[in-house]
Amino acid sequence: MALAGSTRRSADPAVDDHLGEQLLRSAKDREEQAIVARRIERVLRDRAVWVAAADEPVLVRMANIQHLATPIRAQLAEPVGALDLAGLLHPTPAVGAEPAGAASMIPELEGMDRGWYAGAVGWVDAAEDGELCVALRCALLRGEVARLYAGVGVVRDSDPVAELAETEIKLEALLPVVAT
């Protein structure tokens, strides 16, 4: 599943639905979603008998955020272990894989080491089956200090103020975990 494009949730169901509808209609968020979905499809197509992706993204609602999601299914031509497949898909466009060369600019522009941010998190069993996702929200704990990480997809129509607000929404999910 490709996840990209986000907005906040609301306790008011009508407002929550409105926010979700705005997200579904957002050209900027749909572009972000399409970039991620196309990359996944392209990687899978090279190794699959067939690949099927939904024509339109759907909403996935979590506790404090909702995302655009494109379900993607594929029948691989030959068995591929979960870690090998993750290696083929990583890094995703969400963390700088596109446009080409963007990932190499990030350390210079950010001026910090991302550590394990954006790595694969999940499980893999002895048969190499598994389920993994990209760690786009994570925390590094060192003694009494917690460094929280979250990010956004930046595309042509991105607004820095809106992207900062989206990052803050994503970080809010981590605060209760590290505050205890």
Kindly label every feature range from the protein language model.
Residues 1-107, 176-179:
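Contiguous alpha-helical scaffold segments within structured protein domains
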